[in-house]
Amino acid sequence: MTVLSQAHCEACRADAPKVSEQELADLIRQIPDWRVENRDGILQLEKVFAFRNFARALAFTDAVGALAEAEGHHPALLTEWGRVTVTWWTHKIRGLHRNDFIMAARTDELAKGAEDRA
């Protein structure tokens, strides 16, 4: 369990600062299996989780959704047979905030507990 996975999101405003390059470098080391993607100039965190079947992938999607609702911070989720792609970024600031790294770490913790993962 990481420090990030024990943290909670803070309310984010449209004028909240994006993570700096140094913060990005420090935070990504705490979630090494996540990739930083640049989509139309917007940095995002992304990871693909593998499962044995669609039912397990869907259950994980539901668990991530429940976590997102509890924290008030929501990812893009793509659920397919045997896999779920999770993408975190902060829509209000069109980039990465510390909240995204917290949620990525907490998503990893959910995955560790997912039953019958491939």
UniProtKB/Swiss-Prot annotation:
GO terms, molecular function: 4-alpha-hydroxytetrahydrobiopterin dehydratase activity
Family stated for the protein in its record: Belongs to the pterin-4-alpha-carbinolamine dehydratase family.
One Pfam family cited in the UniProt record for this chain: Pterin_4a
UniProt cross-references to InterPro entries, sorted A to Z: PCD_sf, Pterin-4-alpha-carb_dehyd, Pterin_deHydtase
Annotated protein name in UniProt: Putative pterin-4-alpha-carbinolamine dehydratase
Catalytic activity: (4aS,6R)-4a-hydroxy-L-erythro-5,6,7,8-tetrahydrobiopterin = (6R)-L-erythro-6,7-dihydrobiopterin + H2O
Signal peptide segment: none
An annotated GO BP: tetrahydrobiopterin biosynthetic process
UniProt keyword Ligase, yes or no: no
NCBIfam families hit by this protein: PRK00823.1-1
Enzyme Commission numbers on file: 4.2.1.96
Keywords: Lyase
SUPFAM superfamilies attached to this UniProt entry: PCD-like (SSF55248)
Enzyme class: lyase
UniProt entry tagged with the keyword Lyase: yes
Gene source species: Azotobacter vinelandii (strain DJ / ATCC BAA-1303)
